[in-house]
Amino acid sequence: MEEIEGTNRAAVESCHRVLNLLHRSQQQDHVGFEKNLVSETREAVIRFKRVGSLLSSSVGHARFRRAKKLQSHVSQSLLLDPCQQRTTEVPSSSSQKTPVLRSGFQELSLRQPSDSLTLGTRSFSLNSNAKAPLLQLNQQTMPPSNYPTLFPVQQQQQQQQQQQQQEQQQQQQQQQQQFHERLQAHHLHQQQQLQKHQAELMLRKCNGGISLSFDNSSCTPTMSSTRSFVSSLSIDGSVANIEGKNSFHFGVPSSTDQNSLHSKRKCPLKGDEHGSLKCGSSSRCHCAKKRKHRVRRSIRVPAISNKVADIPPDDYSWRKYGQKPIKGSPYPRGYYKCSSMRGCPARKHVERCLEDPAMLIVTYEAEHNHPKLPSQAITT
């Protein structure tokens, strides 16, 4: 059994060498390639014959029985190259035995009487009696037009697959086109809604009572009120009555007029002269909010203890209302306001000096609106 396996392995290796030579046929010399191919092919045939003889011999209880040759309805002439049929004549006798070796992509046919080798679309004829082996190589391939006649089922399957792919592509294109159309309609609807909303806002503003009509050098706002009296107001304060219209004419004022205008301009939300309504109480007020300028002065005084709450006393009473940590300093900053008199705007904040922790930095803001009260007790 081991002998049969070794002989079979050697025969398969010889067949692989023949296939490698055929694969590298274009890279080698023509004369040397023919000699190597003939010798390797002969060796492969001999080894396969040796395998057949070992299997046919009766060794032990195992016997090798040749199967009857199945008659195929397809003639072998259809599987061969048409050019090969014209050049090579295949003997048809019942006494000839043709063992066939098939690989994954090629068909190898070995015939004993004539020692001929047919491999795919290439045919080789070997003659051992001649002085030099003869090699007939036919490299002509079957034209693509003959393939559909041999495989009609595969052709139909390919056509069906192509039709399915085309239908899928058409469906995808239609879906994409519908999606783009819906997206464009949505954008158009949003734009229309936005324009409608803006038109409503403009209409509300116009119905509020002010409409501006611009000319080259004058701006004429008109009041849409039936009970409004007819007057005309200029920059210098003079009032003139005009029949039929209520208009305010603004010319280009000089620098002195601008200063007087800014000084006399009042907020309409302030109310009466006594200030019953504060200017900043309404969100519709457009008065300029000026930040109060606070005078600050800082002094350094020695600390009276290591506690943060202990601050050196002065002429006023102070109440602590906040504390905040300082970035980069382990000591916080304390905030105090004057408690000597109610409503005093004076403030101060105390922090420990980073260079000298025994000193305190006291910063005063604003001024006291009351005299000093030395008799009061100082509280922190």
UniProtKB/Swiss-Prot annotation:
GO terms for cellular component: nucleus. Residues 84-98, 139-148 have a biased composition (Polar residues). Transmembrane segments: none annotated. Residues 307-373 bind DNA. Keywords: DNA-binding, Nucleus, Transcription, Transcription regulation. It comes from the Eukaryota. It is found in: Nucleus. SUPFAM superfamilies: WRKY DNA-binding domain. Induction: By salicylic acid. Its main location: nucleus. This is Probable WRKY transcription factor 21. The lineage of its organism: Eukaryota, Viridiplantae, Streptophyta, Embryophyta, Tracheophyta.
